[in-house]
Amino acid sequence: MAPVNKSDKDRVIIFDTTLRDGEQCPGATMTFEEKLEVAELLDDMGVDVIEAGFPITSEGDFQAVSEIARRSKNAVIAGLSRAHPADIDRCAEAVKFAKRGRVHTVIATSPLHMRVKLNKTPEQVIETSVAMVARARNQIDDVEWSAEDGTRSEMDYLCRIVEAVIKAGATTVNIPDTVGYTVPEEYTHFMKTLIERVPNSDKAVFSVHCHNDLGMAVANSLAGVVGGARQVECTINGIGERAGNAALEEIVMAINVRNDKFPYWNKIDTTQLTRASKVVSAATSFPVQYNKAIVGRNAFAHESGIHQDGVLKDASTYEIMRPEMVGLKQSSLVLGKHSGRHAFVHKLEEMGYKLGPNQLEDAFTRMKALADRKKDIYDEDIEALVDEEMAASHDRIKLTSLTVIAGTHGPQRATMKLDVDGQIKIEEAEGNGPVDAVFNCIKRLVPHEAKLELYQVHAVTEGTDAQAEVSVRLSHDGRSMTARAADPDTLVASAKAYLGALNKIVMKRQRDTVTTAAAS
């Protein structure tokens, strides 16, 4: 655990970029409301800096960053900008209402990126960096500068440009391993050398931002801290471009559990890590792999008889941390068809949900209906039910009823009733199998050009009456949208998941139309 005598020099600032770098993961787009929910949770759990988005990219991103800034309580709210004047100004405008705002500007510094991507000389990159940091500092006190592809940059050049941007006013200097190329020992030496050679390095906080292309993002991040960095940039569940980013939960628990090797501390409330993982997974429709460290379903599961015997005698035989440390509670048979509202509300509060009266009533009704169809109600069932209810609250297309005729002979036929913007529509369709019939029915009811990229099914809990959780990814106009849904009936879950992804496409098209109209 964290040392008793805490000092600022040993504090590691946790910079979460789930809402920016994490959302750049293909198919992980979040709605405006989902971004606000994730940001509130990150703030509550003690994240120091929340990178809320990339304001210049769209009106939607600007509005999300601005609203998160307005609602912020304790965290610094950062926005990303390229090294362009318009980016800097737009970013500063987006975070200006935060209690503490930050402009985070980035430019490439490796020979390859400067030559191929930027088409700039090293001296031009220094000149641009200094000018943009100074421009940002004229508008805000907290400015972070990032050297994209930093670990493939030349050390002598990096020392010169870092010294220059600190002199221009950068308060944080971030050296990313943008393509996940470095290894721990190398990164420790790299950061240590850089900090020692930059004359004014004591005037800024040094930061690391590691990608997971070789599976070493967390190890490299910790190595960077050993080398002198005091800010770690990471995401919930490690989501991010390509192979992802360093996982926040793994960074934090590695420091806490192995404080003998990493004598540092942070402000994260670790009991909220599991909840944060589930909220982000629901918002992005990206399931967490079962064997994911810290927050995976099997992270604290023991099936081997030898392991079970050891854990029953003393949990420390096979557990290096207690499940309670990360907010994990074992599945329990608490709710059923005889449960009342009071017990249901208490269970939701215990699991960290805050629902409004209408959402609560809808969730309670669905729980009772599920209890009539399913013998045992587990925590995972409640989470799947409520997460789906919250995600569907803004949907324009809703499933009212579904009947499927399937068997060994004859075509498979689906009959579906949808509520489309308050109008009830009914249609029938055949298909090559029941799922195909269901999806063909949706296409008849809501004509669209989206292509099915992914269809996955897995059980939420065990048993023949377990809920099926279906993931569907649709692509449209070069964008991918993913949604998940759960139901004891796999076909119903399939229809809901498909409609969830379709609703995201409709919402995106609507937002783009509004943005275009506002710009004209």
From Swiss-Prot:
What InterPro entries has UniProt attached to this entry?
A: 2-IPM_HCS-like, 2-isopropylmalate_synth_dimer, AIPM/Hcit_synth_CS, Aldolase_TIM, LeuA/HCS_post-cat, LeuA_allosteric_dom_sf, LeuA_bact_synth, PYR_CT
User: Which PROSITE patterns does the UniProt entry name for this protein?
Assistant: AIPM_HOMOCIT_SYNTH_1 (PS00815), AIPM_HOMOCIT_SYNTH_2 (PS00816), PYR_CT (PS50991)
Which parts of the chain span the membrane according to its record?
none
Q: What is its main location?
A: cytoplasm
According to the entry, every stretch annotated as the Pyruvate carboxyltransferase domain falls at: 12-274
In what pathway does it function? Amino-acid biosynthesis; L-leucine biosynthesis; L-leucine from 3-methyl-2-oxobutanoate: step 1/4
Q: What class of enzyme is it?
A: transferase
GO cellular component, alphabetical, reads: cytosol
- Indicate what this protein is called per its UniProt record: 2-isopropylmalate synthase
| Species for this entry | Bradyrhizobium diazoefficiens (strain JCM 10833 / BCRC 13528 / IAM 13628 / NBRC 14792 / USDA 110)
Gene transcribed to yield this protein: leuA
